[in-house]
């Protein structure tokens, strides 16, 4: 078996494990399922991303890759962190006083982030969030990501457990789901350990809106 380092080597290893050479077209679908599941389950420090936007009304659309918010702040001097409140509390605040000023609270509901008070002028808003795991593809520049670089076993076992229903063999799913769950728990534990042994890596800030 070849070392798993990228998109193609993952496909090759999945086929080798299953002793098949006709799965090239379906393995990428399994990769996508693994990426989607782990995007929901993991809150790894390598998933942290940052984005900025000009906040000039009470609503702003979050980044399309967002799976969970971590922090929202106004890039004032000094920076001002917004406090998260529930949509119900936001509604109560609006009902009592639809004020304008420097935003101090936010609520996340569906595809919108709402702030309160409504901004009295344009502010630069910075959002720190957990983003989806970038999909790996055959396209140049997209054949690897942090998950396959640091945790290729999770990708492999996640793909292999998807092979069971496709091949009509439940034992494949049972076996590799066990390995997959072990790998996921090790990723979570590794991230927990590293949070207390060093700083969270710096992330590039993208512009939204």
What are these regions (language model features)?
Residues 1-209:
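Glycine-enriched, solvent-exposed interface loops adjoining structured elements
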């Amino acid at each position: 078996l070849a070392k798993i380092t990228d998109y193609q080597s993952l496909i090759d290893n999945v086929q080798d494990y299953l002793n098949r050479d006709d799965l090239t077209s379906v393995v990428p679908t399994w990769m996508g399922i693994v990426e989607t599941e782990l995007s929901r389950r993991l809150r790894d420090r390598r998933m942290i991303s940052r984005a900025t936007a000009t906040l000039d009304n009470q609503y702003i659309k979050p980044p399309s890759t967002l799976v969970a918010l971590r922090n929202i702040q106004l890039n004032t001097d000094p920076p001002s962190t917004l406090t998260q409140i529930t949509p119900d509390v936001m509604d109560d605040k609006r009902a009592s006083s639809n004020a304008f000023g420097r935003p101090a609270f936010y609520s996340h509901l569906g595809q919108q982030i709402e702030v309160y008070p409504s901004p009295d002028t344009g502010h630069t808003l910075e959002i720190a969030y957990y983003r989806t795991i970038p999909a790996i593809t055959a396209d140049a520049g997209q054949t690897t990501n942090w998950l396959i670089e640091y945790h290729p076993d999770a990708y492999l076992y996640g793909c292999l457990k998807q092979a069971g229903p496709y091949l009509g063999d439940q034992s494949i799913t049972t076996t590799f789901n066990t390995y997959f769950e072990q790998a996921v728990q090790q990723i979570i534990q590794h991230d927990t350990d590293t949070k207390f042994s060093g700083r969270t890596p710096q992330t590039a800030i993208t512009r939204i809106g």
